[in-house]
Amino acid sequence: MEKNILPIKKAVLIFFVFACGYFISALLRAITATLSPLLTTEFNLTAGDLGLLAGGYFLGFASMQIPLGYLLDKHGPKKIISAFLLIAIIGTVAFALAQSFSGLLISRILIGVGVSACLMGPLTGYRIWFKDEYQQRANAWMLMVLSMGFVFSTLP
């Protein structure tokens, strides 16, 4: 892809939009641990069931990594991240409305698929839109945002 360097103000805005998506990705990744007492009570889940819910997220996430590279190269990060976050929203709403373990599991897989672009999409965008000297800093800040998402996921 050809570089198309953005002005600094636009680059900062783009970073914050991407960072919000990555924060939500981290939050959704870890939230089953926070919700485990409620899920165990409400759905009569075992520890194995909770593990499957956590694994469902990673199954969806991992299954998209190879197609994601192709899609990012073909359509660009803006379109792909938007489309994938829509899938994550659908999965999150489905999780909130689920009436059974299978509904929860399918929702977690959808969430994993939906947030699978929240790291590689921004990294691709930074490569295209940011000056070379800002890319490493943006990547480091993204990892900090991930950590913040994990911390915030511990709050009820």
Report each predicted region and the residues it spans:
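Extracytoplasmic
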Residues: L13-L45
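Small-residue-rich transmembrane alpha-helices and their cytosolic helix-loop interfaces
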Residues: Y22, A54, F58, L85, ...
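Small-residue-rich segments within alpha-helical transmembrane domains of MFS-like 12-TM solute carriers
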Residues: A26, A30, G112-M120, V151
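Residue-level signature of mid-helix packing/kink "hotspots" within the transmembrane helices
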Residues: A30, F58-I66, F150-V151
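Extracellular/periplasmic helix-loop-helix junction of adjacent transmembrane segments
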Residues: L35-A62
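Conserved MFS/SLC helix-loop-helix module at the cytosolic interface between two early adjacent transmembrane helices
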Residues: S63-Q99
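Paired small-residue
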Residues: G91, S102-L110
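Cytoplasmic helix-loop-helix junction between adjacent transmembrane helices
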Residues: S107-V145
